Amino acid sequence: VPLCATCYYEDYTRCTRCGELLHNDSACYLSDDDDDPYCPDCRDQLLYAEIHSYSYKPRPIFYGDGPRYFGVELEIDNAGEDPDSAGKLLAIGNRGGERIYCKHDGSLDEGFEIVTHPMSLDFHLHEMPWAEILEKAIQMGYLSHKANTCGLHVHISRAAFGANRGEQDFAISRVLYFVEKHWNELLRFSRRTQRQLDRWAARYGYKDDPQEMQEHVKKGYGSRYTCVNLTNDATIEFRIFRGTLKYNTLIATLQMVNRICDAAIFLSDEQLKALSWSEFMAGIREPELIRYLKEQRLYLNEPVESEAEL
């Protein structure tokens, strides 16, 4: 039935996903999104999907004690963007509550990404069944490190860096300074090539002190595809790490990010400028991180034998 313009704009809308014309009374909305209308079919597909669209962002559920929360995005590839496979991983990760979800990622060939809700480091280490999730992904034929398409992205809550935006910005500028100052070591830690980082996690460029770094960033240098993505309102995102299905590597990566945050929050600008890599290493006590640093020949020249990355 043809509609006049007045009726169309006042009483009708279109499904955000498929474009179907809907009367306003028939439009459906997701619980965490009051802006985008859907037809009933598309709403159900999104609500009960094993693999959500790339834009899917549920209301965050926080696990463990804050304010320093870590959100993980782990990309896996090579065995299909298969809802059944995603469902098997969700069944493991979501025992006792929704802790992970899966999303489409256009940068992958035959896979998807596993995303966690925000969790404390302790929760990631002792409550999240990471070892079981990674083992199941391997059993189903997925790769991450070896796929050459995958990243391991770590979000940290902005609230962890200070009580207000100004305090947060100062501490985050020290994160960027640390990353730039120790770029060569972190490049080795990341297991990425410089070419990969130039594409997906580019440098900001080294400055002589953290405050210069902050001014540099304020001028608009940087985008989502930077080593530390600052474009999100509630988090900063480390994008430099290559994907992995190796449990120790994943845990060590979270521990390294945590250590960098410690340095940025608790050291002054002058202390951070004076901090050498060897001095930074000397304070590390976490066994998973120490083992990984030795595997990458970054820890006091003490290499160890290691299992292959997958």
Give the positions of each predicted feature.
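Helical (often loop-to-helix) elements that flank the catalytic cores of nucleotide-handling enzymes
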Residues: 123-134, 160-191, 246-261, 298-306, ...
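Short cysteine-rich clusters marking metal-coordination/redox-active sites
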Residues: 4, 15-18, 39-42
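Histidine-centered divalent-metal-coordination microenvironment in nucleic-acid enzymes
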Residues: 111-113, 145-162, 235-239
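Short linker/helix segments within small regulatory modules
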Residues: 1, 26-36
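Aromatic/basic-lined ligand-recognition segments
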Residues: 71, 169-244
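Short Cys/His-rich "knuckle" micro-motifs
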Residues: 14-16, 25-29, 49-50
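Flexible helix-coil linker/hinge segments at domain or subdomain boundaries
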Residues: 145, 184-198, 262-292, 298
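Terminal catalytic/cofactor-binding subdomain
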Residues: 40-141
